[in-house]
Amino acid sequence: MKRTFQPSRLVRARRHGFRARTATVGGRKVLAARRARGRKKLSA
């Protein structure tokens, strides 16, 4: 059985990146929550 984590910078950015977050209402809520918490890094 192969490992489940097959790193890809492009896929990571497209799925969890800033633009992916801002594209949906839920994603914007995630960003707002992370801002409220004072996270240094908002997205991947």
Swiss-Prot record:
Disulfide bonds listed in the record: none
GO biological process, any: translation
UniProt-listed InterPro entries: Ribosomal_bL34, Ribosomal_bL34_CS
Entry superkingdom: Bacteria
Keywords: Ribonucleoprotein, Ribosomal protein
GO CC terms, sorted: ribonucleoprotein complex; ribosome
Alphabetized Pfam families for the sequence: Ribosomal_L34
GO terms assigned for molecular function: structural constituent of ribosome
UniProt xrefs under PROSITE patterns: RIBOSOMAL_L34 (PS00784)
Family the UniProt entry places it in: Belongs to the bacterial ribosomal protein bL34 family.
Stored NCBIfam families: rpmH_bact
HAMAP family given in the database record: Ribosomal_bL34
Name the UniProt record assigns to this protein: Large ribosomal subunit protein bL34
Origin species: Novosphingobium aromaticivorans (strain ATCC 700278 / DSM 12444 / CCUG 56034 / CIP 105152 / NBRC 16084 / F199)
Gene it is expressed from: rpmH
